[in-house]
């Protein structure tokens, strides 16, 4: 039995911001992105990346277009130090990419950080210390003044180290009041202002103030309120870039980041697919693709999402969930019958109108935009309906079933999937269609036919069809204005099966002079029973005659 949560947990206090403006704001451009897979992401892995995996991840991030990449904590890890030296000494950092390194406010760590950066063309030195009320009390046993002193002394040491560094390295600075969301807002402004006093940023050379939701503690709107409150209260706002670093403890990191952008932030730190401590960092792929679907260029190349996922899984040794937004195996897949029908109609409408704007029910994005095909969009199981079955047969085999046949055949498929409890593949669907319609050879199996004018009737023809029935080959004869009517007459004379043709459709299976034709016949009996028949042949007439016999065979069996 669950405990009473009111006895153990307290609600997060709201931010006093009655005149908040972010709810009416709109995201119109991508932020500055900083990928932290090689630090925040790596430290959360069961098996942290070795040198080869780190290089592969770094190369992927560069290929995608990330221009700021946090590469590690070189002063705290020999592995990170060696990796950074490898990137620099082997000239592996593109000219337009700035690396970022993390350091705490300790002289020995800061000195080691600058050693690691020797020879880099450009870098961001990221200084941080925790400022939350909880950590001040429990971890550091320091008051506000003591924590501010740590930050200021750290900033001074970073600036001194920068003064001694090679002039060939273009340095920028970043400060994070770690656990920002658990810090009193007035104190967050106070400590950041103190650090600004050391770095003396300008509008041309701004300081990055990174405001982490180190542990997600409230609903996304609260983070947005905190960011807007901070941006308003901070002096010289034009001299800083406000950076976000959301975590996903409550499952709303993406929403928190988006609302905080609306509240005035300029930059976001995150990881591919949200890898990171506990429930992860904010997912840069989802954030970027969310913007893409709103017509905003994220500035990142997600055109081959499966390749991105493959490398991320290889480097992190963690799978991406099948339902992960945009990248999961099943995110564009519909099993539901009503969804499949709507998607099928939407794709047909797009093809017919040839419009530029994407509008397909249940598909917020064209899968082709991220390197996916339509093949996995519709799959068939016991929850599926006629729309999904029809879509797959048309997409993979060129069969455009009439609506009535869609209903009829979907019942056959439903019976199979209900029995097996499993998905039926495209190949399995085609096999079932063949067995149900194209292989329905009892009692009649078509072999050949010929027609001739009927001397006894104007506009009438006599058809002789050679069929195999009961294991024997024989001819059946009938009269009619055309081959179909004549074959119906022949069946009535031969077996007494009095069918009426209710509907007839035909089309070619593919363009070209050698294309095969497919014919669909709906036939009924006087007692109201009806069934479809299907025939395929290089000749339209033969295809239609095969379809008549197929329907007759089904009605004979009933």
Swiss-Prot record:
Domain Pyruvate carboxyltransferase: 31-306
Gene3D superfamilies with a match to the protein in the record: 3.30.160.270, Aldolase class I
GO BP annotations, alphabetical order: L-leucine biosynthetic process
Annotated TM spans: none
Region of interest (Regulatory domain), ranges: 440-558
Cofactor(s) required for function per UniProt: Mg(2+)
InterPro entries the record matches: 2-isopropylmalate_synth_dimer (IPR013709), AIPM/Hcit_synth_CS (IPR002034), Aldolase_TIM (IPR013785), IPM_Synthase (IPR005668), LeuA-like_post-cat (IPR054692), LeuA_allosteric_dom_sf (IPR036230), LeuA_N_DRE-TIM (IPR039371), PYR_CT (IPR000891)
Catalytic activity as recorded in UniProt: 3-methyl-2-oxobutanoate + acetyl-CoA + H2O = (2S)-2-isopropylmalate + CoA + H(+)
Origin: domain of life: Bacteria
Keyword DNA-binding: no
Pathway(s) served: Amino-acid biosynthesis; L-leucine biosynthesis; L-leucine from 3-methyl-2-oxobutanoate: step 1/4
Function, as annotated: Catalyzes the condensation of the acetyl group of acetyl-CoA with 3-methyl-2-oxobutanoate (2-ketoisovalerate) to form 3-carboxy-3-hydroxy-4-methylpentanoate (2-isopropylmalate).
Alphabetic keyword roster: Amino-acid biosynthesis, Branched-chain amino acid biosynthesis, Cytoplasm, Leucine biosynthesis, Magnesium, Metal-binding, Transferase
Subunit structure: Homodimer.
Family per similarity comment: Belongs to the alpha-IPM synthase/homocitrate synthase family. LeuA type 2 subfamily.
EC number, as in UniProt: 2.3.3.13
GO molecular function annotations of the record: 2-isopropylmalate synthase activity; acetyl-CoA C-acetyltransferase activity; magnesium ion binding
Annotated protein name in UniProt: 2-isopropylmalate synthase
Annotated gene: leuA
Location of this chain's protein in the cell: Cytoplasm
The keyword Coiled coil is assigned to this record: no
PANTHER family referenced in this protein's UniProt entry, alphabetically: 2-ISOPROPYLMALATE SYNTHASE, PTHR46911
Major localization listed first in the record, in broad terms: cytoplasm
Residues that bind Mg(2+): 40, 245, 247, 281
GO annotations of cellular component type: cytoplasm
């Amino acid at each position: 039995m669950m405990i009473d949560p009111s006895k153990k947990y307290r609600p997060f206090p709201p931010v006093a911001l009655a005149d908040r403006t972010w709810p009416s704001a709109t995201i119109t451009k991508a932020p500055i992105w900083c990928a932290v897979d090689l630090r925040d992401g790596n430290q959360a892995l069961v098996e942290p990346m070795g040198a080869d995996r780190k290089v592969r991840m770094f190369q992927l991030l560069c290929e995608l277009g990330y221009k700021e990449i946090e590469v590690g904590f070189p002063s705290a890890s020999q592995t990170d130090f060696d990796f950074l030296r490898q990137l620099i000494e082997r000239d592996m950092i593109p000219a337009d990419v700035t690396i970022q390194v993390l350091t705490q406010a300790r002289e020995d760590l800061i000195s080691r950080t600058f050693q690691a950066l020797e020879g880099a063309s450009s870098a961001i030195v990221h200084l941080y210390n925790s400022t939350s009320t909880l950590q001040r009390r429990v971890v550091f046993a320091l008051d506000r003044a003591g924590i501010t002193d740590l930050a200021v002394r750290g900033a001074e040491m970073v600036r001194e180290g920068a003064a001694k560094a090679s002039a060939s390295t273009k340095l920028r600075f970043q400060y994070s009041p770690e656990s920002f969301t658990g810090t009193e807002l007035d104190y967050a402004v106070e400590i950041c202002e103190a650090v600004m006093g050391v770095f003396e940023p300008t509008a041309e050379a701004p300081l990055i103030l990174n405001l982490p939701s180190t542990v997600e503690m409230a609903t996304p709107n609260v983070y947005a309120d905190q960011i807007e409150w901070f941006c308003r209260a901070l002096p010289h706002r034009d001299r800083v870039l406000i950076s976000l670093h959301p975590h996903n403890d409550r499952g709303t990191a993406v929403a928190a980041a988006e609302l905080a952008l609306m509240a005035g932030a300029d930059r976001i730190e995150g990881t591919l697919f949200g890898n990171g401590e506990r429930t992860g960092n904010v997912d840069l792929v989802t954030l970027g693709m969310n913007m893409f679907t709103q017509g905003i260029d994220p500035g990142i190349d997600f055109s081959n999402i499966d390749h991105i996922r493959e490398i991320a899984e290889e480097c992190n040794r963690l799978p991406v969930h099948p339902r992960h937004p945009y990248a999961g195996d099943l995110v564009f897949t519909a099993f539901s019958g009503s969804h499949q029908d709507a998607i099928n109609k939407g794709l047909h409408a797009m093809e017919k109108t040839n419009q530029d704007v994407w509008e397909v029910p249940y598909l917020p994005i064209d899968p082709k935009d991220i390197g996916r095909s339509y093949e996995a969009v519709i799959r068939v199981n016991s929850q599926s309906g006629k729309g999904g079955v029809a879509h797959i047969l048309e997409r993979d085999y060129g069969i455009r079933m009439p609506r009535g046949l869609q209903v009829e055949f979907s019942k056959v498929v439903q019976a199979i999937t209900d029995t097996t409890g499993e998905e039926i593949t495209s190949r399995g669907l085609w096999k079932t269609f063949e067995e149900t319609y194209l292989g329905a050879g009892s009692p009649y199996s078509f072999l050949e036919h010929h027609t001739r004018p009927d001397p006894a009737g104007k506009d009438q023809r006599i058809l002789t069809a050679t069929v195999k029935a009961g294991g024997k080959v024989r001819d059946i004869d009938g009269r009619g204005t055309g081959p179909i009517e004549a074959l119906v007459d022949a069946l009535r004379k031969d077996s007494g099966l009095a069918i009426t043709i209710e509907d007839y459709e035909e089309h070619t299976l593919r363009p070209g002079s050698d294309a095969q034709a497919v014919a669909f016949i709906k036939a009924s009996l006087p007692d109201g029973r009806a069934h479809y028949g299907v025939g395929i042949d290089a000749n339209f007439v033969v295809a239609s005659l095969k379809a008549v016999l197929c329907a007759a065979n089904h009605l004979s069996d009933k």
